[in-house]
């Protein structure tokens, strides 16, 4: 297979030997697998949108590398378990329309999200009782009840109040106060770095082989993630390409529909978990920085619990399948995107499940349709990756019975009174270990791995850092040297 891939790759290179390249173009051309779906941070829910919005907008608070909350905009005091007072810091950033971020913008953004049931962020702030402006520099937030992780929920992009009041279309023309401003164009996604005018152009190239090919031909300057291991290995051996990598904290997983007559049986979910040889998949198809996962958060996160490893056990899986359906195979449908690498993983999982008596049909969809189906609960099984999660309250949003969309992220309609009660207790104690263990016992989802991060770029590129959560913050300091 690797020999065939290399031959095909070299053949494709020969076809484009005379293709134009961007080596004299000052813009950095960033090849991405999926383009952002929504550049309004109040409504964005896909990974590409969140990564790009993080460049365009300034957040009230953000997570540092130790998963602690920091803010360049405000300091705060906890007056009581339900009252917080915030004070503006000096040297606040300017919005890209020229106005300076102020207290009106913060309050307007929060009030707008609270009042809009269509925003996925609204659930984060349902516990806010009221916001009170104390002065031009200070404001208070009063909660309905105590929330030990409330500050972590304030990781929200601030929008200009004047544009909010005018119903500005932030999705089509985002205006933030981050390190990059959006450059309106008819058919391209371009950002300009405020401090020096460096332009980043984001180019959607869905096929990873084509993405790597364009990198070799200098039609693009850099790619990050979403590359099969054979492509990574090939690029590592190219003298014109530099590679940087790190461990990852984003979890790839399989989701289930718990309204399904078959998948609501925990025995079937257990059988599926034991039938998939994750170790083999990681060893042969993912990069060396990928780690097996048993829970949402990676081991370095403070909320991570000590769990027993789910072992590959096809014999026990077969026995469970026979106990459920002794006379015939079980038929299920698995949805995934058209990305060739994700399709390859799905095909291997299909073959592994066939060995234990599960007939898995793979249905591929374009990214927009696929993600819409997931959001609407239109699936039996699906494969996806949670990106950038850091607040343990995510467990409530994914697994509480009242968190069915649009009130939360429980897209599989998971319902467990025991877990509901454990979640309620964890929200108060901030001890999530019992919740995490019970979710594993019930196979509330099937964790696969924390996929390692890798960036490949031409020698013209320097100062790009890869982050554990796969964000694009490395673009804040990236440099392109046209004289290379």
Residue ranges and their predicted role:
Residues 32-81, 111, 175:
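N-terminal lobe/hinge region of extracytoplasmic solute-binding protein
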Residues 52, 75-118, 214, 262:
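Aromatic- and charge-enriched surface segment that lines or borders ligand/interaction sites
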Residues 87, 121-164:
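Surface-exposed binding/hinge segments that line
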Residues 146-201, 207-210, 315, 319, ...:
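Gly/Pro-rich hinge or "lid" segments in bacterial periplasmic/extracellular proteins
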Residues 186, 275-303, 340-350, 374-484:
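Detector for C-terminal structural segments
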Residues 187-233, 359:
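Ligand-site clamp/hinge motif
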Residues 199-202, 224-314, 337, 407-417, ...:
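Local pocket/hinge segments that shape ligand/substrate recognition
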Residues 322-388:
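Ligand/substrate-recognition segments at binding pockets and active sites
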């Amino acid at each position: 297979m690797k020999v065939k891939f290399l031959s095909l790759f070299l053949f494709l290179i020969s076809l484009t030997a005379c293709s134009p390249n961007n080596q004299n173009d000052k813009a950095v051309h960033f090849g991405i697998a999926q383009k952002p779906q929504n550049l309004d941070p109040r409504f964005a829910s896909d990974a590409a949108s969140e990564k790009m919005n993080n460049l365009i907008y300034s957040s009230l608070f953000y997570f540092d590398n130790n998963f602690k909350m920091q803010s360049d905009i405000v300091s705060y005091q906890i007056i009581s378990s339900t009252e917080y007072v915030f004070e503006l810091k000096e040297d606040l950033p300017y919005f890209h329309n020229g106005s300076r971020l102020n207290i009106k913008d913060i309050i307007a953004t929060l009030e707008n999200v609270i009042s809009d049931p269509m925003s996925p962020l609204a659930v984060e702030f349902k516990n806010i009782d009221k916001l009170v402006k104390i002065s031009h520099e200070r404001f208070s937030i009063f909660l309905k009840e105590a929330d030990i992780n409330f500050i972590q929920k304030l990781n929200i992009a601030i929008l200009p109040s004047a544009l909010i009041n005018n119903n500005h279309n932030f999705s089509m023309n985002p205006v933030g106060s981050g390190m990059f401003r959006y450059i309106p164009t008819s058919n391209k996604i371009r950002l300009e770095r405020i401090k020096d005018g460096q332009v980043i152009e984001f180019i959607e190239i869905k096929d990873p082989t084509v993405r790597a090919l364009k990198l070799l031909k200098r039609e693009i300057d850099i790619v990050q993630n979403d590359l099969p291991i054979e492509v990574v290995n090939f690029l590592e051996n190219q003298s014109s390409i530099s590679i940087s990598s790190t461990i990852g904290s984003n979890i790839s997983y399989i989701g289930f529909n718990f309204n399904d007559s078959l998948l609501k049986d925990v025995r079937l979910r257990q059988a599926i978990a034991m039938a998939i040889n994750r170790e083999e998949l990681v060893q042969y198809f993912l990069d060396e920085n990928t780690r097996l996962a048993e829970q949402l958060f990676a081991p370095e996160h403070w909320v991570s619990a000590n769990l027993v490893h789910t072992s590959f056990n096809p014999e026990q899986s077969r026995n469970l399948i026979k106990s459920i359906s002794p006379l015939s195979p079980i038929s299920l449908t698995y949805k995934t995107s058209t990305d060739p690498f994700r399709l390859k993983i799905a095909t291997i999982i299909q073959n592994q499940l066939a060995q234990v008596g599960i007939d898995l049909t793979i249905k591929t969809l374009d990214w927009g349709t696929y993600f819409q189906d997931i959001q609407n609960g239109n699936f039996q099984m699906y494969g996806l990756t949670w990106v950038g999660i850091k607040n343990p309250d995510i467990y409530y949003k994914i697994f509480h019975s009242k968190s069915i969309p649009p009130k939360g992220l429980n897209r599989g309609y998971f319902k467990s009174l025991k877990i509901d009660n454990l979640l309620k207790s964890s929200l108060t104690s901030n001890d999530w270990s019992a919740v995490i263990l019970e979710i594993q016992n019930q196979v509330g989802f099937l964790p696969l791995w924390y996929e390692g991060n890798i960036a490949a770029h031409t020698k013209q590129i320097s100062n790009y850092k890869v982050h554990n959560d796969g964000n694009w913050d490395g673009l804040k300091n990236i440099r392109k040297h046209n004289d290379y």
